[in-house]
Amino acid sequence: MFEFEITSDCINTGARTGIFHTPNGKVNTPKFMPVGTLATVKGISSKQLISTGSEMILSNTFHLHLQPGEKLVKASGGIHKFMNWPKPILTDSGGYQVFSLAKLNNISDEGVEFKNPRDGSHVFLSPEKVIKIQMDLGSDVAMAFDHCPPHTANENDIEDSLERTHSWLQKCVETHQKSNQALFGIVQGGKYPRLREYSAKYTSSFDLPGIAVGGVSVGEAVEEIHSVINYVPKFLPINKPRYLMGIGSLKEISLAVANGFDIFDCVLPTRLGRHGTAFFNDERLNLRNARFKNDFSPIDKTCKCETCKSYSRAYLHHLIRNDEILGLSLISLHNIAHLIRFTNAISTAIRDNCFTNDFAPWKTSSIAHHTW
């Protein structure tokens, strides 16, 4: 039911194209995955999302458990029917949100107790419960519960959290019993190569349908992000889809693809869109600026998204300056289409044996010149 098929390899780097087969369709990789935290990509309908070429989206277990609750989603027929999305869905376990958003009361090997950020009530999440929630949600891919410490934590604290992540992974595997849902483990270890290698090898030993690398782009220096991207893949299985969590810039995506990563997600396209900022090549255009008031060109004349085909920068500037919701939605839609188009072009370049020339991260000028 779940299969990852590698369809081509770059002769000079670790980049590859592939097809990840799921019960709700296939995902052509490399691929960017829009974030729909609460079973919605903010301001964008499922029909619009399909028009961008999106093939898989991410929703969040932590947030959906708190509101509206997994039992309601299950009663609706599962998350696909609940949000009217016919393609694959991956649910993040919520580990990052628990440790970054909630006021923690207690962390133990059994799980985490915290205050609900919505109403202050006490909530307890264990690895077993997190898996059961995701089984009720009915996503195609469930993520193991992990402990993601702050990037400022010292090596001893990160090692302690890593042992907890590994213990929880074992419990997640033992609890997960849904044949039509894949379980991915998550590699942690912070900026420490020894811990990253240890975690990659341990997580890989479970032979799960896919594997993710977490604890990246959580406030650390860019050099540390690149170090993890360059180092960890050599310890991951080749025949599994590799998911790099929380990455959405062109440079980091191209670097990650060069090192053999396949799937990416990031909130930036919609977060920036809601503030009036649009992606253009490897730049960001703040459409709130006065210089766009009389600019009747689209955000990107080479982009085929609904926004660029139908609306000018001047109109979007007008919407943003007047706090019109439509403007935020249209820019977010373009930003998602931009990243989908970028990963699609990377796939074409890999198949045509020109990835190194066109998209390798050290060739930043080729990205800036918009070869895709």
Swiss-Prot record:
**Chain positions recorded as substrate binding sites:** D92, S93, G94, G95, Y96, D146, Q188, G215
One GO MF term on file is: metal ion binding
- Record GO biological process: queuosine biosynthetic process; tRNA wobble guanine modification; tRNA-guanine transglycosylation
GO CC, sorted alphabetically, is: cytosol
* EC numbers for this chain: 2.4.2.29
Q: Which domain of life is it from?
A: Bacteria
Where in this protein does the record put region RNA binding? 246-252, 270-274
Recorded metabolic or biological pathway in which this protein acts: tRNA modification; tRNA-queuosine biosynthesis
> Which UniProt key words apply to this protein?
Glycosyltransferase, Metal-binding, Queuosine biosynthesis, Transferase, tRNA processing, Zinc
Which residues are catalytic? Answer: D92, D265
Cite the cofactor comment: Binds 1 zinc ion per subunit.
Per the similarity annotation, which family is this? Answer: Belongs to the queuine tRNA-ribosyltransferase family.
Q: Which HAMAP family match?
A: Q_tRNA_Tgt (MF_00168)
Which protein is depicted?
Queuine tRNA-ribosyltransferase
Q: Which organism was this protein described from?
A: Prochlorococcus marinus (strain MIT 9301)
Give the gene that encodes this protein: tgt
